[in-house]
């Protein structure tokens, strides 16, 4: 008999709506014993089968659902089916947009909770973020090797969230050849260098692909400030869009060095690109005090909020930084501002920008809205999958 997680009476509603998480507060008891990440059956208080998922005793998310089909086993064949299903959409997208790199698996939205897989050319970069994903590592890797024999697999499960589920961080080659220090990829006509082994996340922010492209429509003959620039994707896109100057700001000199290489790789005018190592909050205040002005500002900060207790502080941070940006824009200037914090809703983010505009003493029009690129889908039953949101704002 399988191990069963029994829900308290009336706590099955989210599973009946096919939400993939079971929170600890909904659980009545366990029947049997399961190890960290092991597959268990989830039943209601009367014993009716609801789902099959991965058990995580140390997490507030006590189980993550693999399947709502009682006949489906969690094995190599299961992962092969999920991968093939996800690949169909990415194949179409890659052909339409001329991509050689994309998110192959977007966790829960692709039916594989806690699993992120990005493809960069012939390298698959793996992040296993949950106990269940780690427990199924061997089956997943086996499925990947069969479906993608041409690809090397590199593990970037070096993320702090693993510690919340009692797991160590892991990093290194799984199969195949080691990725080069900087791997060139192509995106909307740009060549960009990706540091798979040591870069942020899996090496590059694929989710901002379409936002980088959208930037080009606003920048012709404009002076652009690119905040939290990382390796310069927005800067390269701005130069391709015909900007007169782009200033990229980041705290990492290594990232700025790669940004410079990316400009050179695309044979763009390096004299129009400036790279500044500094704290963005501090530099924006310095620019304001000096009377500096820009026509377009890209504001793409890292995640400010990890949990609900940090949300109010994050709101203040987002408001302050957007207020400073609005103050630096010429009349008719464009602010492209983003939040990658999952707990920050689009409505709340829009209100924060409106409040920032009031504090800056400027009127702002919302003219365009952004979200993560189409290879980062959001399944309808898991709205939490929509984590990246952004706005193009015209400052009056």
From Swiss-Prot:
Keyword Transferase tagged: yes
GO cellular component, one term: cytoplasm
Top-level lineage group: Bacteria
NCBIfam families documented for this protein: PRK15128.1
Similarity section: Belongs to the methyltransferase superfamily. RlmI family.
PANTHER family, per database record: RIBOSOMAL RNA LARGE SUBUNIT METHYLTRANSFERASE, S-ADENOSYLMETHIONINE-DEPENDENT METHYLTRANSFERASE DOMAIN-CONTAINING PROTEIN
Pfam families: Methyltrans_SAM (PF10672), PUA_3 (PF17785)
Organism: Shigella boydii serotype 18 (strain CDC 3083-94 / BS512)
Function field: Specifically methylates the cytosine at position 1962 (m5C1962) of 23S rRNA.
Protein name as catalogued: Ribosomal RNA large subunit methyltransferase I
Domain PUA, chain residue ranges per copy: 2-81
């Amino acid at each position: 008999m399988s191990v069963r997680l029994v829900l308290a009476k009336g706590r099955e509603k989210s599973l009946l709506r096919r939400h993939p998480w079971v929170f600890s507060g909904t659980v009545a008891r366990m029947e049997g014993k399961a190890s960290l990440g092991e597959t268990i059956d989830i039943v209601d208080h009367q014993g009716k089968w609801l789902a099959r998922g991965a058990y995580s005793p140390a997490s507030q998310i006590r189980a993550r659902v693999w399947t709502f089909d009682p006949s489906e086993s969690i094995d190599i064949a299961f992962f092969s089916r999920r991968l093939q299903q996800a690949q169909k959409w990415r194949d179409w997208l890659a052909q339409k947009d001329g991509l050689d790199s994309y998110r192959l698996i977007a966790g829960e939205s692709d039916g594989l909770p806690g699993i992120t897989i990005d493809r960069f050319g012939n390298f698959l970069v793996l992040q296993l973020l949950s106990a269940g994903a780690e427990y199924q590592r061997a089956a997943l890797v086996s499925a990947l090797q069969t479906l993608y024999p041409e690809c090397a697999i590199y593990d970037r499960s070096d993320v702090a969230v693993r510690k919340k589920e009692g797991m160590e961080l892991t990093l290194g080659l799984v199969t195949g050849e080691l990725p080069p220090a900087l791997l060139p990829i192509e995106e909307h006509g740009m060549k960009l260098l990706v540091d798979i082994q040591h870069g942020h996340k899996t090496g590059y922010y694929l989710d901002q692909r379409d936002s980088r492209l959208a930037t080009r429509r606003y920048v012709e003959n404009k002076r652009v400030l690119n905040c939290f620039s990382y390796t310069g994707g927005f800067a390269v896109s701005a130069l391709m869009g015909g900007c007169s100057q782009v200033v990229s700001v980041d705290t990492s000199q290594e990232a700025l060095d790669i940004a410079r290489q990316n400009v050179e790789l695309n044979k763009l005018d390096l004299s129009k690109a400036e790279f500044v190592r500094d704290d963005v909050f501090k530099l924006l205040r310095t620019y304001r005090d000096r009377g500096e002005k820009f026509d377009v500002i890209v504001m793409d900060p890292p995640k400010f909020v990890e949990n609900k207790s940090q949300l109010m502080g994050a709101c203040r941070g987002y408001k302050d930084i957007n207020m400073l940006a609005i103050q630096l824009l010429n009349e008719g200037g464009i602010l492209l501002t983003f939040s990658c914090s999952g707990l920050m809703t689009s409505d709340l983010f829009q209100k924060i920008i409106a409040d920032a505009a009031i504090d800056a003493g400027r009127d702002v029009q919302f003219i365009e809205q952004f979200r993560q690129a189409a290879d980062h889908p959001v399944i309808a039953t898991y709205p939490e999958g929509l984590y990246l949101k952004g706005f193009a704002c015209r400052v009056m």
